[in-house]
Amino acid sequence: MKFHTKLYKVGYPLYGAKFVCDDQFVVTGGGGEGNNGVDNKLTVLKVGSSEGNGLRVDEVCDATLPANDDSPTALDAVGDTILIGCNENSAKVKSGAGNSHVRKFRYDGKSLKFESAADIDKSTNPEDYTKVIRLSKDGSEAAIASSKNPPSMAIIDPRNYSVKYEIETGRDVKDLHFSPNGKLIGYITESSLEIISTVTGSCVVRKTDFDRKIILSKMKFLDDNNVLIAATWASSKGILLTKISIKSGKTTVFWSRQISSKFKGITAMDVNDQMNLVMLATNDNSVLLVKLRNLSVGKTFTQVHGFAITRVIFSPDSRYAVSISAAETVHVIEIPSDFADSRSLSESTTQWLMNTIMVLFLAFVLNSMYKEDMHKNVLNYFRSVKSIDSSSILSMEDMEQVTLVGTISTSVRSTTQRFESSKSVSSTSVVARTNVSEKERSQQDPVKKSPEQHQQNQQ
């Protein structure tokens, strides 16, 4: 199965990315405060096919942020709304004059336009920054995780930046996501999972009894009731995927499996909209495409970037898989349409062997039956069953027999033995009925006397 790939150099370190349609995605990053010559920017890129059946990446538009501000650290987008996390310059933050670290842009398909910004954290420490930004599917809510101490997460209305709830998480938030229906927000620390209601702001389910030998890294809702978590071993190589049900206010582990023993850490994860592929970025700058159907690594792209991978994203139609890096590069993979459901060589070989074994076993059974004349026994058995079924048609039917002495009613039983018994009973009934008939006739018609007896009586 052939994959087409393209490596594209943007020109500045990248820290956030999101598809805005099937073939366009926005990236953000920059050199940060004091890094002269490397801008802080947002850029919209378009991916498509080029001549020779390859891939091409083109720049659609960009927007440059103030040069003295910090570099953007997080991004999410829904529809035409783009939110980024980006601190203002450190002098302003320290002065207490505010830090508009959440900024909103609009994309109309041709250009990016800055719309507004707000200070959610109210921090005067320039080291505090926005770690994660997530928008709900309909764009009506946003969740923002901060690095400040104590660690916290805020749920806001992105239209006016009003804070609905602020939650102290206790430990650094590794990742967070909204459920598809937007009623829940889930986040993980390195050792716990917590699900919060976006309606009440209270915790609805929590899991803290994970194996102490693993470190939770990334998470995403598979649907409204199930969460996928990616984790690694704390002291050895290995990547694990775990599916957890949160239905009915309790957590249930559906499955947990190690999918690779070659990598030490995970830097990014995404699940496609069809929920059949998972993309993972590893600590050695490789990208894994994992099939959820059987939890197998379908394809590994080794060391596609020269520096840390900061984000991986699927296109809405699952045609493209994109990874971005602090090495200023974008790597695009075009995924074959049948890849998620395809079988590997080992799977195909195993299936062929199983089918062959089943055919040989069936042939052996049929041959043994033929040698032992079992087919004749089976045929005779079904014939006997058919014969019994045919005789049963007479079961419980009433029969009438007309004789010289009257009508006799008999009941025929459903088996031959009972039928013979019934005939005997009927014969007895005939004799009894005959005797009764003769007696009745003698009473009704007296016996005629001889002439001699008649004369004697007259005398």
UniProtKB/Swiss-Prot annotation:
The keyword Membrane applies. The gene is SEC12. It is a single-pass type II membrane protein. Residues 371-459 are lumenal. Coiled coil: none annotated. GO terms for molecular function: GTPase activator activity; guanyl-nucleotide exchange factor activity. It comes from Candida glabrata (strain ATCC 2001 / BCRC 20586 / JCM 3761 / NBRC 0622 / NRRL Y-65 / CBS 138). The chain crosses the membrane at residues 352-370. Keywords: Endoplasmic reticulum, ER-Golgi transport, Glycoprotein, Golgi apparatus, GTPase activation, Membrane, Protein transport, Repeat, Signal-anchor, Transmembrane, Transmembrane helix, Transport, WD repeat. Guanine nucleotide-exchange factor (GEF) required for the formation or budding of transport vesicles from the ER. This function involves the cytoplasmic domain of the protein, which is thought to interact with the small GTP-binding protein SAR1. Required for autophagy. This is Guanine nucleotide-exchange factor SEC12. Residues 417-459 are annotated as: Disordered. WD repeats lie at residues 256-291, 294-334. Belongs to the WD repeat SEC12 family. Residues 1-351 are cytoplasmic. It is found in: Endoplasmic reticulum membrane; Golgi apparatus, cis-Golgi network membrane. The keyword Coiled coil does not apply. Residues 436-452 have a biased composition (Basic and acidic residues). Gene3D superfamilies: YVTN repeat-like/Quinoprotein amine dehydrogenase. GO terms for biological process: endoplasmic reticulum to Golgi vesicle-mediated transport; protein transport; regulation of COPII vesicle coating. InterPro entries: Sec12-like (IPR045260), WD40/YVTN_repeat-like_dom_sf (IPR015943). Its main location: endoplasmic reticulum.
